[in-house]
């Protein structure tokens, strides 16, 4: 009996020891250490979230998430691109250029890197570097109509109207319904005093998209030929986008000196006095 009891006691003590061992293990925190693959997957998810926040205008939150994504995974060029976009949105242009350089070091064959660089250089009014970046990107994707259009815009800013028209034509050839390129081609022809050609182009742009810019551009063309039509077009343009009442806003849209002078004269017409007042009121209310 004693021998049997001793055996039972040993079993009982062993059981208690094992039980206590389980309880002890339950108190030790368990850390999950993710694999490199899981970390990379997580960084891409964070990067996508950062891009979504950027899309919805939450630029500071987007920047913080994008920074976290590249901290987790420094070897994905797409994450560096997302970070650069967030930095651009936050006006951190030099930091964005550093991020783009890191992306370029990982994958120099990604045209988006060079197109993003060009957008920064344009904001800095560094037209020379913007052109170099655009041409580098176009060597990779030669049929990117937006990049070709942007090159045309740079030539328009430089008052090199023949080259501007040449690149706008290239963009239109790739995308015939590209009304912005058609519109800007009209701006270039106006500065060359080819008003009838501008009229034709602005009308074509309006047929594709009844936007304020070609409407007011056409109005400026018709100012001396058909003032009644010009007034109606200007009224419609200012309703669609009141900002076009401002000289500096039109300048930002690459309007040249000659079309600016024509537009200023048109906007002084007494029949547009109330329309101009309403447009300025809307601008003040939205600011």
Feature roles, as predicted:
Residues 27-34, 236-287:
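Terminal, low-structured helical/coil segments at or just beyond the last alpha-helical repeat
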Residues 39-78, 82-89, 119, 123, ...:
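Alpha-helical segment of the N-proximal tetratricopeptide repeat
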Residues 42-43, 77-78, 111-112, 145-146, ...:
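Helix-start (N-cap) detector for alpha-helical repeat units in TPR-like alpha-solenoids
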Residues 48, 82, 116, 150, ...:
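Canonical tetratricopeptide repeat
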Residues 54, 81, 88, 115, ...:
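Position-specific recognition of the canonical hydrophobic site in helix A of tetratricopeptide repeat
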Residues 56-64, 89-102, 123-136, 157-170, ...:
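Structural signature of tandem alpha-helical TPR/SEL1-like repeats
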Residues 72, 106, 140, 174, ...:
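Structural marker of alpha-solenoid helical repeat scaffolds
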Residues 203-212, 216-246, 270-272:
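TPR/TPR-like (Sel1-like) alpha-helical repeat modules
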